[in-house]
Regions:
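Core catalytic alpha/beta fold that binds nucleotide/phospho-ligands
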Residues: 1-127
Length: 127
């Protein structure tokens, strides 16, 4: 299941801290809704966070500029979120294959190209 929260950037909390708190809140909400309980999140240096004692429960959290998403499932999963915005062609060359660049550049407007680029970017990041 996927859970989403939005917020207005600004205020007394640094946005990354706010996103972290919202992400963990969404995770706990999702765990309660799907499994009727929560688990402690643990993370070893350099590894992905996991739920202590919940080998059959997976989660993934992503956040960016006022948007936080969390997915919870009984199988491997991934999520990513980005705001659609202008991007540099050099970035596209680094992260997209030739056929993917063609897909992006086929967009009829700059807005369509941005949407196509970030669709690919988030798909790749979620894996």
């Amino acid at each position: 299941m996927i859970y989403l929260a939005t917020y207005e950037p600004g205020g007394s909390l640094y946005n990354r801290e706010r996103e972290h708190i919202l992400g963990r809140s969404l995770l706990n909400f999702g765990l309660m809704k799907e499994y009727g309980r929560t688990w402690e999140v643990e993370q070893e240096t350099g590894s992905k966070p996991c739920l202590k004692g919940a080998e059959d429960v997976e989660f993934n959290i992503s956040h960016t500029r006022g948007l936080v998403v969390c997915a919870v499932a009984d199988r491997a999963l991934g999520v990513d979120t980005e705001r659609i915005r202008p991007f540099k062609e050099g970035l596209m060359r680094r992260v997209c294959s030739e056929s993917e660049r063609g897909f992006v550049l086929e967009g009829r407007s700059e807005a369509a190209r941005q949407e196509r680029f970030f669709r690919l970017w988030t798909l790749k990041e979620s894996f």
